Amino acid sequence: MSEEFKIEIVNPEKSFLSKEDVTEVVVPAFEGEMGILKDHISIISFLKPGIIKIFSKSGEDNYYVEDGIVEFKNNNLSVLTSSIFNIKDIDKDKISELLTQAEENSKNSDITDQNKYLVDQKIDVLKTLN
């Protein structure tokens, strides 16, 4: 019996990724890192800044996301996000640029506690990539 399921990641520009041989996905949900396997209970969750890890027979792929929504239903995982990058395609200059921007946003005196939390999460993740 196959232990694979389908994932589709969509951003505003295009269908970013569609894969049918996925064996596990780990997403940075607000509730914490969430591992999803075939036949997982149906879920809908918000994403926080972090790394989506996709495992398949061909290996592991990692993607940086800043936000989004994840839905798993009937062995189909859908991710809607406004910003996603394949980690192997991000150069150090882009990471530094995103980190500088996040650190500047963090210093804004008008930032809400919720936005401060998200910016701090983004900074932590970007520092691990840098």
Swiss-Prot record:
Q: Which CDD domains match?
A: F1-ATPase_delta
GO MF:
ATP binding; proton-transporting ATP synthase activity, rotational mechanism
Q: Which GO terms describe its cellular component?
A: plasma membrane; proton-transporting ATP synthase complex
Concerning Gene3D superfamilies, the annotation shows: F0F1 ATP synthase delta/epsilon subunit, N-terminal (2.60.15.10)
Please indicate if the UniProt record lists Membrane as a keyword.
Answer: yes
User: According to its UniProt record, where is this protein located?
Assistant: Cell inner membrane
Query: What intrachain disulfides are recorded?
Result: none
Offer one Pfam family short name for this entry. Answer: ATP-synt_DE_N
Q: Tell me the InterPro entries matching this sequence.
A: ATP_synth_F1_dsu/esu, ATP_synth_F1_dsu/esu_N, ATPsynth_dsu/esu_N
Give the membrane topology.
Answer: Peripheral membrane protein
Q: Which SUPFAM superfamilies match?
A: Epsilon subunit of F1F0-ATP synthase N-terminal domain
Q: Which UniProt keywords apply?
A: ATP synthesis, Cell inner membrane, Cell membrane, CF(1), Hydrogen ion transport, Ion transport, Membrane, Transport
Which proteins does it associate with, and in what oligomeric form?
F-type ATPases have 2 components, CF(1) - the catalytic core - and CF(0) - the membrane proton channel. CF(1) has five subunits: alpha(3), beta(3), gamma(1), delta(1), epsilon(1). CF(0) has three main subunits: a, b and c.
Family statement: Belongs to the ATPase epsilon chain family.
Q: What does this protein do?
A: Produces ATP from ADP in the presence of a proton gradient across the membrane.
Q: What is this protein called?
A: ATP synthase epsilon chain
